[in-house]
Amino acid sequence: MTACQSISTAQTTVSNKITGLFGYNEKLPEIDPKGIVDISKATIEQYEQLSANLPLNQWVYLENEKQGIYQLQNKSTEGFVLSLRLNCKISSHPPTFELQDVQGKRILYGYDKEAGQIQFLLDNKNYGNPFDPFQRQTLSRFQQQLASAKVIKLFHASKLYRFQNQNAELLSKPVSCRENS
C-alpha cells in the first residue's frame, strides 16, 4: 500500500465515522432477490446513491408506498437508464417510457413529436415507437413480446441504447405513469 492509498483509506474511514455521527451514513435500502426495493423510508441522499448504484442489465422495481410512487428501471452497462411505464396504476394515464443519460437527465420520453424517429427493437425485431398514441396496436404486440425478449434496444438520432431484459417478470407490476411525460 502506498502512502497516498493509506491517506485515502484513512480519509474515507474518518469521513464515514463523522457522517455516521450526524446520521448521514445510514444503510441504503436493499434490493431483494426478485429485484424489488422499498424506498419509502429512504432519504433523498440514499435514493440518489441507490440510483447511482443500481444493478446493471436488469429491471429493478422501486416502490414508495408512502408517496404512492412506483418505478421500473433498467440501467445499461453504459449507465443509461430506461424506465418503462406499461401497467399504469391510474388507468387513465397512457403507457410511456423515459430514457435518461448517465447524469440522470431525460433524453427521450413517451411520444415526443419533436424528437424525431424512435425505434424499439426486441431481440432485433423492430416495433417502431410503440408509445406513439396513433399506433396502440403496436404497443399491445410490443408488451406481449417484451415478456420473453432477451435484449431491448432503443435507436434514436443515430445512437443505439442497449438493455438486457433480466427480471422481465417485473414488467407486469403496476407503476406510476404521469400524463404528458
Annotate each predicted stretch with a short phrase.
Residues 1-2:
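Bacterial N-terminal signal peptides
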Residues 5-181:
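A generic "folded-domain core" signal
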